[in-house]
Amino acid sequence: MEYTTLIARLKNASESFVNLEMQLADPDIANNPKKLESIARERAKLEPLVLDFNQLLDTDKEIGDSKQLLKENRNDKDMESLINEELFSLEDLKNQLIEKLTIALLPKDPRDERSVMLEIRAGAGGNEACIWAGDLARMYERYGQKIGWTVKPISASESDMGGFKELVISVKGDSVYSQLKFEAGVHRVQRVPATESQGRVHTSTATVAVMPEADPVEVKIDPTEIEIGTARSGGAGGQNVNKVETAIDLIHKPTGIRVFCTQERSQLQNRERAMEILRAKLYEIQLKEANAKERSQRLMQVGSGDRSEKIRTYNFKDNRTTDHRLGSNFALEPILAGQLDDVIYACLAQEQKRMLEDFNENEN
């Protein structure tokens, strides 16, 4: 991006920021909580950009002042050396800010702000794969709780030996998809199962699909294409469990997608949850079709985001987690405890670097 173009766009953003601050001071808006929240959210998004822009302007001014000072001290070699050293640092800072601001102005994935449905399925490895699926679910639950998201299981198929054959988790909060989209794919574990008497290491897998929540307007579902059955829920619920059919078994006939929802206490709530899951699954199909038609506009994920792509290996013997997209290793225990920030931010940095390279290629 040309420097003059960058500055022009940043000035527009700065003007928008000032305008939003003026609106926040407006008594009429202050009396409208919904509008106030919307404006405050927009202001919060722009604030880091404006702060970096102001730092860029300050750095530019310091560079100009240093160059003028250099002209005035041509005969003083010691002073000239000090000024050149300062100029080198300032130019380096300026280049860093330009790259950071250029990335910030690149087109965003419109789904980044959304909440998601996480679908975790046991893969190869039998009962151990089901246990591993449960471990992954707890990892994401801990990560979400640390950030302040609302994490809730909404559909589960438990294994007889523990863990889950399949589990769908609702994760609600700000910008959930922007972070969890990097978790889509195959997660492989290498460890000695509790049931292994010979101490042999087994390899098991679980697949994770990250589905941004879809608005009913985006995904229209024909009621005539849905087959709904009911069943008695199992699990917590006291005497109500086996007497009332609260579970919902939903089938979308055109795609064959089946959703079995038991987590809520009423049939109506389970039906609503089942429809949310179905809508997210259909939305994911739409996204994949769009991405297949236009490769340059893929899911903006590191790798393909395909649930069949192996993205990470968790090695218990060596206490090591390897992210295959990054080619980097991380300590195992903190990752399983929900401390995913380092790996997610590394994936984000890799994504931003690739986006910047693509942008520069298109500019040339």
UniProtKB/Swiss-Prot annotation:
PROSITE patterns named among the record's database cross-references: RF_PROK_I (PS00745)
InterPro entries with a match to the protein in the record: PCRF, Pep_chain_release_fac_I, Pep_chain_release_fac_I_sf, Prokaryotic/Mito_RF, RF-1
Post-translational modification as stated in the protein's UniProt record: Methylated by PrmC. Methylation increases the termination efficiency of RF1.
Modified residues (N5-methylglutamine): Q239
Top-rank taxon: Bacteria
GO cellular component, one term: cytoplasm
Entry's localization field: Cytoplasm
GO terms assigned for molecular function: translation release factor activity, codon specific
Gene3D superfamilies: 3.30.160.20, 3.30.70.1660, 6.10.140.1950
Keywords tagged on the record: Cytoplasm, Methylation, Protein biosynthesis
Principal cellular location given in the protein's record: cytoplasm
Alphabetical list of Pfam families matching this protein: PCRF (PF03462), RF-1 (PF00472)
Entry similarity comment: Belongs to the prokaryotic/mitochondrial release factor family.
Primary role: Peptide chain release factor 1 directs the termination of translation in response to the peptide chain termination codons UAG and UAA.
Protein name: Peptide chain release factor 1
